[in-house]
Curated annotation (Swiss-Prot):
Originating organism: Wigglesworthia glossinidia brevipalpis
Residues at the catalytic site: 45, 72, 192
Subunit organization: Homooctamer; tetramer of dimers.
NCBIfam families: pdxJ, PRK05265.1-3, PRK05265.1-5
Residue spans crossing the bilayer: none
GO biological process: pyridoxine biosynthetic process
Gene field: pdxJ
Protein name: Pyridoxine 5'-phosphate synthase
InterPro entries: Aldolase_TIM, PyrdxlP_synth_PdxJ, Pyridoxine-5'_phos_synth
Chain sites annotated for binding 1-deoxy-D-xylulose 5-phosphate: 11-12, 47, 52, 102
Subcellular location: Cytoplasm
Pfam family, one: PdxJ
Length: 245
């Protein structure tokens, strides 16, 4: 049985800290607790406006954790330079809109193919694994393969927002796209809006190798603590994976 990895996004620890402008809660400490509880990687989204995690946080997290740092960034030159300075294990390139509350859609690989190819080439030359956050659309996935991305992260936002009846169609689309990406030689990840309830159907897609989950785990941690919140998610992932073997 292949292990499904869990990346824990700690952005919203910083969001809570920034409400009062102090030092606590510290995203570095929570990243360490997530790792102790079984997180396979730590994800941070370093935004252009530093609305939650900032560059200092990311550097401290990288120095403090034993697992992998996955850095989500926009494709602006300034942000790519920050990634080069930080040198994370992996970078996930995402679209960014200053007015959005959270990432609203996947990156348009087709439209930005030439530029993205240069960015990917530069990051990979420094030993950084590169992922593209894409909507479950075959043409976007094909373009991701053509510009030598290592991975795609399928946007599960639409699936996560729908009720049970509607999301059957979306989950089938995600399955098809995951299989397609796998055939193209891309490693497949998934994330956005996943929680302790809707993650179960995603776990059953064998081509998906890693999930990135943040808000629901951080929210749960306010009730049960960070380590228990991560363990509960890992238990759900493991039990569902076993069930479908």
């Amino acid at each position: 049985m292949s292990k499904l990895l869990l990346g824990v996004n700690v952005d919203h620890v910083a969001s809570l800290r920034n409400v009062r402008g102090g030092k606590f809660p510290d995203p570095v400490q929570l990243a360490i607790l997530a790792e102790i509880a079984g997180a396979d990687s730590i994800t941070t989204h370093l935004r252009e406006d530093n609305r939650h995690i900032n560059e200092k946080d990311v550097i401290c997290i990288k120095k403090s954790i034993q697992s992998r740092l996955n850095l989500e960034i926009s494709t602006k030159k300034e942000m790519i330079n920050k990634a080069i300075n930080i040198l994370p294990y992996s970078c996930c390139l995402v679209p960014e809109n200053r007015q959005e509350i959270t990432t609203e859609s996947g990156i348009d690989v087709i439209k930005n193919k030439k530029y993205l190819k240069k960015v990917i080439c530069k990051l990979k030359s420094l030993g950084i694994k590169v992922s593209l956050f894409v909507d479950p659309i075959k043409n976007q996935i094909l373009s991701s393969s053509e510009i030598n991305a290592d991975c795609i992260e399928i946007n599960t936002g639409k699936y996560s927002e729908q009720d049970k009846k509607e999301n059957k169609e979306e989950i089938n689309l995600i399955k098809l796209c995951a299989k397609y990406a796998n055939k193209l030689g891309l490693e497949v990840h998934a994330g956005h809006g996943l929680n302790y309830f809707n993650v179960r159907s995603i776990v059953n897609i064998k081509e998906i190798k890693e999930l990135n989950i943040g808000h629901s785990i951080i929210s749960r941690s306010l009730i049960v603590g960070m380590q228990n919140a991560v363990k509960e998610m890992k238990d759900i992932i493991y039990s569902e994976k076993i069930k479908w073997q």
